[in-house]
Amino acid sequence: MKEYSIGTKCVQAGYAAGNGEPRQIPIIQSTTFKYDTSEDMGKLFDLEAEGYFYSRLQNPTCDTVARKIAAMEGGTAAMLTSSGQAANFYAMFNICECGDHIVASSSIYGGTFNLIAVTMAKMGITATFVSPDATEEELNAAFRPNTKLMFGETIANPALTVLDIELFAKVAHEHGVPLIVDNTFPTPVNCRPIEWGADIVTHSTTKYMDGHGATLGGAIVDSGKFDWMAHADKYPGLCTPDDSYHGITYAEKFGKEGAFITKCTAQLMRDFGSMQSPQNAFMLNLGLESLHVRMPKHVENGQAVAEFLENHPKVAYVNYSGLPSNKYYERAQKYLPNGGCGVVSFGLKGGREAASAFMKALRLGAIETHVADARTCCLNPATSTHRQMNDEQLKEAGVPAELIRISLGLEDKVDLSADISNALDAIK
């Protein structure tokens, strides 16, 4: 559906009903699938034929939604996972192994920071974290001979820094490695990282894509542009025979358009299991169908609240790239011309005590760990999502102790501003 707009892809990509078939995608709630002969099933296990044999690896409902997300991002292949964390782990571990190295932006979601800095380190995969504002020279200096990928978030959670995707992609490609970008906050409605040079795009579909706080999920999209065989020495998992699949070499058999997702499905999903359920995929698709309508409203509310907060005497600073005063405004105009998202972060004069009083006084904004929902919610990340970080790490990640992250939902912006104003008045 390359010729169609993003809105049309949100509604119709991935599934075309045949004559007399369901207009809505079917939920294939089955663990397994029947075949007439052992030979037919054997072809699936040999990756010689397309089809399904066990829903831990693939399911028709999940594949339908994955195809839609691939079309929305402009990729050649995609897969769903059980969560955004699973998507990021699979995307990185698919091309990394013990002894390898990652270069990652320091301004990322706390759970992802911990995944890279602690959990993957236990697997023998080390990382160097760089500022999202690092110069080309500084980025180059972070590379080692064993570096296998770069990672960053289009809009960081919760610092809301904006990644210079084009620069990160340029440096990554000069070193012969792919750039993986988590595009959760802007969604492909507001930014498509592949158009700026990213090779792999990940999502927590739990957020805006679902949009209603109803289903957990993640997604990985492959651009199909990175030439794995041109860097075969770096990526033996893709470019040498896989003994667990009869000696298949993924990059040779499936080409650069299909090797990454095929290996991720056939190998990692087989061994680790984190597949999204068909029911969750169905509900995710319902969210995707209205994503292009919802995102402008989230951006509108985010912009209105950011402007209100910027002029309030009890607010020390506001992080929102839609504000002309924001350090990322010019970069956002490049990558996010239609706006980024509905998430605003800000610091209150008075530190943690003021933050606590503010959140306690909110009526429309619920205190919860979720973000990017139809309903407004808020959080103090230093005491919740990022509490595993020490003070130095919090500073590097752009998450000081007084920071509040507020995710503006789809309520009326006048009511939201009034509620926030009343909560600010409660600070003594």
Where in this protein do the model-derived segments appear?
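N-terminal "arm"/small-domain region of PLP-dependent enzymes with the aminotransferase-like
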Residues: 1-59, 67, 404
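Conserved PLP-enzyme active-site core in the AAT-like
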Residues: 7-16, 78-311
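Short loop segments at secondary-structure junctions
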Residues: 32, 223-226, 348-351
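Conserved N-terminal alpha-helix of the aminotransferase class I/II PLP-enzyme fold
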Residues: 37-89, 111-119
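Glycine-centered tight turns that cap/initiate beta-strands
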Residues: 74, 146, 314-317, 402
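PLP-dependent enzyme catalytic core of the Aspartate aminotransferase-like
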Residues: 117-118, 126-127, 141, 145-148, ...
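Short hydrophobic/aromatic beta-strand micro-patches
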Residues: 221, 345-347, 407-409
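Conserved small-domain helix->loop->beta segment predominantly found in fold-type I
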Residues: 272-275, 279-281, 286, 290, ...
